[in-house]
Structures are given as structure tokens and as C-alpha cells.
Amino acid sequence: MNLLKKQFVKRNYHKETLKITIDMAWPAIVESFFVAFAGLIDSLMVSSLGSYAVAAVGLTTQPKLLGLALFFALNVAISALVARRRGEKKQDSANETLLTAIFFIVIAAIISSIAFVFFASAIIDFCGSTADTHNDAVVYFRIITGGMIFNCIQMGINAAQRGAGNTKITMRTNVTSNTINILLNYLLINGRFGFPALGIRGAALATISGTVVACIMSVASIFKKESFLSIPYILEQHIRPTLSAFLNLIKVAYSVFFEQVLMRIGFMLTAIMAADQGTDAMAAHQVGMNIMALSFAFGDGLQATAVALIGRSLGSGDPDLAKEYGRTCRLIGAVIAVCLVAIYYFGASGLYHLFFTEDHIVAIGVQIMHVIIFVVIFQICQVIYMGCLRGAGDTLYTAVASMISVTFIRTIISYFCGYVLGWGIIGIWMGVLGDQVSRFIFATVRFRQGKWVKIKI
């Protein structure tokens, strides 16, 4: 608390700015944390089937996220544009953006879903599956991608709601969705209370069921007449999807899309190298990624807050306030990072013992956790600063920075330390650390330069 107070005074933060940031940030943080926590619980429940099952689910993560790259990019554009229009007090333009995005999302999701289901086996094979993981990974991947349209729609609407500052709506949606996911995991993976024991198939069905509920809740949230984003308002004002709105989305999203694709390629190469270390090492790696996702969740929640507040400030013509919101989010993130470092340091062994009874896998996991401790320090702050830049429309810079860091630095260091130096799975995690440090440097330098506040979107 003394550290927080000293930084607060030193940087001349305004109490009102901090209050507004916290009020908007806590629902976004809870939402992101709960999504990551549900992923960790998924792995915990799947681990009851054996380390091969954890590895099988882990194999599907990066190709699934690669398939969602287009939608992640679109979500960044939706949030940034809606936030900017909110600041400009242009409700009609914000709703036009939302409606145009939804139409595009539905078409793109249907096409993507069909392609992933059809090519599932080849994709999983490319990702480094083995005889004991391939079939289960394919089944899981087909179910998840077969229902991706529900996930894509709810992500798009939630992105718009975050841009408008309605973080409590998206929190309720995702907390409900993931609660259903966890409950159905408990019932369907091993078969309880008369439900069939479906194993990995049950885990996938639980995830899809939660996503369907989230989609319904998200759609319902835009049927309120008094909301800034509102279907009744759209009908009343005769708003239609337009080419100009679509082009605005593409203008912001195109560089984010390439950023996402190149990042996912880098992540996938890391996952392939991890899978090459053996099923046990891959299982430990997957749990480590889930634990790291918990720390990312805090940064992601603050990032969503920064996008909304910075977009609104720039839209109303106040770049100094936009910078202050960015610094405030970063300060909160730094305090959270210190707390997580302490938890991960003292709880490393205990966390891995929740997932595995095999001592050699736990030993691998503890070594991974020692790397994650350093990763977290840079990760949360870079995620927030990158979010600030994207929210202002500086997406080309973030794309180049992420490409250099993830696709090249991460991959090269992982290969060198993992194979050339012979450090195995720990060497691969050194690549993860190098990536986070690189992105932190890129993001911090750009944020402090201040050029991003002058970008028009």
C-alpha cells in the first residue's frame, strides 16, 4: 500500500481518475479472471482422465485461437470504435458499427466452423499429436469449433459493450457461462448423478453449452431500449449495416488480424516444441499456460478498461486524460503483478499437486512456475499498454511489435534454449519470458512517446 501511495503522489494521479478506473475495471477483471479460472478448472477436471487428456486438450488451444484471430481483431476494432463514438456522443454511428459487425461475424463464423470441422484431423496432426492424444484432441477440436458461432457472436457484442463502458454486463455474461461450463464438466467428464461419463467429449460439450448461454445473454443485453447499444434504437432509427461502417472496422482491425495470426503462429510453434518434449512435459506445459492465463486475465481486464476510457477521452478531445487513464491502469496492474508473484512463488508445488500425482511432472511444473514468476512482472504491464495503443487506433505498431516479439524472438529463444542448449521444456519457457520482455519494452516506449493520442479513427 505504501508503494501504491508513493506512486500515486509522484505521478500526480487524480483520485477521481482512479475511482472511475477502478469502478469500470473491477467487473472487467472479474470477468477475465473467471474465464481464465474456468480454463484452469477445465484442465483440473480433465486431468482426472490422465496426463494424456490434459495434453490432448492442450493441443487444440493454439489452432482454436488461430481460428478466432479474425474475430479477436474485429473485437478490438469494435471496442475502439464504439468507445470513440461514445466520447463523440454519436449513438447512431456506434449502433451502426455494432450491427455491421454482427452481420459480418455470423457469415465469417459459419465459414470458419465448417472448415475447422472438416480439416480437424490434419490440423491436430500438424500440431504435434501422438498416438495417445490424437483421437481425443480431434474429437474435442471438432465439437469446440463446430459451435464457435455462438462464441463469436457473444464476443462481438461484449466487445461493443466494453467499448461503451458496460463492463458489468459482460461480467455477468461470462461468469454465468463459465459457471455452467464448470458444473457440466463435473457432471459429464466422469459421469455423476446419472449423467453419462463422456470424458474429453463431455468437457467440450460443457464448454459449448456455456457459450450458448453466454450468446443468449449477450444478445438480450442489446434489447434494452435505454441502453447506448440497443436493438430498439436501431429499429427506431432505421439503422442498417453499411459499407462505410465495415470499412472503418477493417481500417482498425486489419493490422490486429495480421498481428493475431502471426502471434498464433508463434504460439503454435512454441506448443509444437512443447509437445515434442513428451506427453508429461506437454501436460505440465499446458497447466503452466493455464496458470499464466490467470495473470493475463488481470491485464486483460485492465486493458478492456483502458480501451473504453482512452477511446472516450480521445473522442471528447482530451488526450491528457487519455494518458492519465493509461498510467492509472498500468499502476493498478503493477500492484496486482507483485501480489501474483508472491502467490506463484510460495504456491508453485501446491498448484501442480492439484493436477498431478506423479512427482516428476510436478517437478517439471515447479520449474515452469519459477519462470512464470518473472513472466508475470512484464506480462500484465505490457498487456495494458498494448491495449492503450490499440484503443487509440495505433494497431499497426502493436502488430509489428507483437510479430517481432512472438513470431521471432519467442520462437528463436525457445528453440535455442530448448534444443541447442538442451534445456528442454524450461528452455521453451525462456522463449516465453523473452517474448514478454520484448513486448513490454516496445509498448512502454510507444506509450511514453505519446504519438498514439493523435490518431484519428
Residue ranges of predicted features:
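Short alpha-helical transmembrane segments in multi-pass integral membrane proteins
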Residues: 1-28, 82-149, 197-254, 310-375, ...
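Transmembrane helical elements of multi-pass membrane transporters/channels
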Residues: 23-42, 143, 177, 210-214, ...
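Transmembrane alpha-helix boundary and packing residues in multipass membrane permease domains
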Residues: 28, 32, 43-44, 80, ...
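Residue-level hotspots within pore-lining transmembrane alpha-helices
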Residues: 30, 34, 38, 67-71, ...
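Helix-terminus/linker motif at the lipid-water interface of multi-pass membrane proteins
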Residues: 37-55, 124-131, 187-198, 257, ...
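Interfacial/gating helices of multi-pass transporter permease domains
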Residues: 46-65, 132-136, 200-201, 244-252, ...
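Small-residue-rich hydrophobic transmembrane alpha-helices
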Residues: 54-114, 151-170, 282-348, 379-403
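Short runs within selected transmembrane alpha-helices of multi-pass transporters and secretion channels
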Residues: 75, 79, 144-163, 170-178, ...
